[in-house]
A protein has these predicted regions:
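An N-terminal domain-start capping segment
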Residues: 1-2, 98
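Glycine-rich phosphate-binding loop and adjoining helix at the ATP-binding site
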Residues: 2-5, 10-15, 21-79
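Short glycine-rich anion-binding loops that position phosphate/pyrophosphate groups of nucleotides
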Residues: 20-23, 86-88
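Glycine/GP-enriched mid-protein hinge/lid loop-to-helix segment characteristic of carbohydrate kinases
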Residues: 50, 56-58, 71-120
Length: 120
């Protein structure tokens, strides 16, 4: 995409990546993304090998909600909820212009939750 847009790596100020699932508190590791088969993927660390700017990892529903809140249909409101259906079912929640990520960036995860070990 950068090449097609005529943008050099040195021109990037920040790189962002969104992933479904549960992320580490520091936003560096995809702890668990069942639908992708990921467990303990150090995604931000891997990206930092290729870019000389800061790298951020966000939950996909939170990233979608933030984009919709800032640039889309929610831009006129202080609080919004964005429901995502794709890599799972999730929600991004914005309250008073702040994303409410919750513990392990999973505050809006709606999809399948295991309640009993080995359960479905």
């Amino acid at each position: 995409m950068l090449k097609e847009g005529g943008i050099g790596l040195w021109e990037l100020g920040h790189v962002g990546m969104a992933s479904p699932g549960i992320l580490s508190e520091d936003g560096e590791v995809i702890l668990f993304a069942a639908n992708l088969g990921f467990t303990g993927v150090r995604a931000a660390e891997e990206l930092k090998k290729y870019f000389s700017c800061p790298v951020s990892l966000k939950n996909d529903a939170d990233a979608a909600a933030l984009g919709e809140h800032v640039y889309g249909a929610g831009k006129e409101y202080r609080s919004t909820v964005t429901i995502t259906i794709g890599t799972g079912i999730g929600a991004g929640i914005v309250i008073d212009n702040q994303i409410m990520a919750g513990s392990f960036h999973s505050g809006g995860e709606i999809g399948h939750h295991i309640i009993v070990s080995g359960g479905r």
